[in-house]
């Protein structure tokens, strides 16, 4: 069963807040945000796939990946990790790039703060996304970000539920 996803948009602050609780330990959810082979399993909303090109998960490191569509179309992105607090939070900047990793002008960029909190139900994930302007946020939402990110989080939930031991 899919748990609820909170998805709040604040036009005045050009921010989006996302929250979801997973029936899994913080360590397990953390791994699915920080290990390339696990990210590739859920980051892209089906029928798209995520393909990691490079990953260096450390402060000032980065993750370059391609979203690969059903017709093999490819869209590239880069995540630069700013601050990382093990099993607690990740601060990162996300940009659209060309195949070589160069930022695409005119495309929205996002600053993310991802939080992982142990709760009775498992792990509460919070994601705060900050945009430079309302126009950038509106453009991102117009590209289907809300539906795509929600589908990805539900795919992650399916994966985590399959790993949970049956009692």
Walk through the language-model features, giving the residues of each.
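Beta-strand/loop substructures that line and gate deep hydrophobic ligand-binding cavities in soluble
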Residues: 93, 100-147
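Intrinsic-disorder/low-complexity, polar/charged segments enriched in Ser/Thr/Lys/Arg/Asp/Glu/Gln
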Residues: 13-19, 26, 62, 76, ...
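Hydrophobic/aromatic beta-strand elements that line small-molecule binding cavities or substrate pockets
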Residues: 20, 52-55, 77-83, 109-118
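Generic C-terminal helix-cap and adjacent flexible tail
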Residues: 158-167
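Hydrophobic ligand-binding cavity/cleft-lining segments
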Residues: 1-49
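Short beta-edge strand/loop motif at the mouth of beta-sheet-based domains
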Residues: 17, 37-76, 167
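Hydrophobic pocket/interface hotspot
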Residues: 29, 39, 63-65, 81, ...
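A short, structured loop/turn motif at beta-sheet edges
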Residues: 26-27, 56-58, 82-89, 115-124
């Amino acid at each position: 069963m899919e748990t609820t996803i909170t998805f709040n948009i604040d036009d005045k602050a050009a921010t989006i807040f996302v929250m979801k609780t997973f029936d899994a330990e913080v360590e397990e959810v953390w791994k699915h945000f920080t290990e390339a082979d696990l990210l590739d399993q859920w980051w892209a909303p089906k029928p798209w796939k995520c393909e990691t090109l490079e990953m260096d998960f450390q402060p000032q490191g980065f993750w370059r990946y391609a979203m690969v569509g059903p017709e093999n179309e490819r869209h590239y992105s880069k995540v630069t990790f700013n601050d990382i607090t093990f099993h607690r939070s990740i601060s990162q900047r996300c940009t659209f790039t060309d195949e070589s990793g160069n930022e695409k002008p005119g495309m929205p960029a996002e600053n993310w703060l991802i939080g992982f909190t142990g709760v009775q139900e498992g792990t509460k994930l919070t994601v705060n996304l900050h945009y430079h302007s309302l126009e950038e946020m509106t453009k991102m939402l117009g590209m289907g970000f809300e539906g795509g990110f929600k589908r990805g989080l539900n795919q992650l939930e399916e994966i985590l539920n399959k790993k949970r031991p049956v009692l």
